A protein has these predicted regions:
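P-loop (Walker A) phosphate-binding loop of NTP-binding proteins
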Residues: 12
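Hydrophobic positions on the alpha1 helix immediately C-terminal to the Walker A/P-loop
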Residues: 20
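Conserved lysine of the Walker
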Residues: 17
Length: 215
């Protein structure tokens, strides 16, 4: 039986994850026409997890989520996604591509929000168990450049809570992701997301060829 493969995409706001996941999905379907390719996002995926996503992404005037509430909501979404979506797909031998996963929780709620990293890892472990990525593609871009992209692609009123954080928050996010990549070099591949779209895509394909036996 074909072994499933789990790839996650990480990075700061405006790094181009959505575009690159779409391009990778198209490339995999072309090269592996008989292989199931499953694409989803975190938070989100199954219907219940999508409802949690709406709470996390939409501002609540006068009652902003405290960091621990964010952490627990992300964990609830991940638990639902792992059991309803990712684990069954991997058992079927699918290639699973997810836009953000637990690394984002550790970086956003830990490095940027200031929660204890060990507490975050314990919560993530409870939520996800043995479901862990085989490869994480970290799309790295300077925060000011990524935020400029988000302003270009969407009106100011369409930005979510994380887009509108201060620049210092996004700088902490980038630092957190790069530290995570340094600590996990076998799993995390750093991609230069400041390059043009096709160059970024080729970097991703090369990282997959080097680290996984699927292409």
């Amino acid at each position: 039986m074909v072994t499933g493969c789990f790839i996650t995409f990480e990075g700061g706001e405006g790094c181009g994850k959505s575009t690159q996941i779409r391009l990778l999905t198209e490339a995999l379907k072309k090269r592996l026409p008989t292989r199931e390719i499953l694409l989803s996002r975190s938070p989100g995926g199954p219907p219940a997890a999508e409802r949690i996503r709406s709470i996390l992404k939409e501002p609540t005037p006068g009652d902003d989520l405290v960091p621990k509430a964010e952490l627990l909501l992300f964990a609830a979404s991940h638990a639902q996604m792992c059991e309803r979506l990712i684990r069954p797909a991997l058992e079927r031998g699918a290639i699973v591509l997810i836009d953000r996963f637990t690394d984002s929780t550790e970086v956003y709620q830990g490095g940027a929000r200031g929660l204890d990293p060990e507490m975050i890892r314990c919560v993530d472990s409870l939520a996800c168990g043995s479901v862990q990525p085989d490869l994480t593609l970290l799309l790295d871009i300077a925060p000011e450049d990524g935020l400029a992209r988000t302003r270009t692609r969407a009106g100011q009123d369409e930005q979510d809570r994380f887009d509108t954080e201060k620049l210092s928050f996004h700088e902490a996010v980038r630092s957190g992701f790069l530290a995570l990549a340094e600590a996990n070099p076998q799993r995390v591949a750093v991609i230069d997301a400041a390059a043009d779209v096709e160059q970024v895509h080729q970097q991703i394909l090369e990282a997959i060829r080097e680290r996984l036996d699927i292409l």
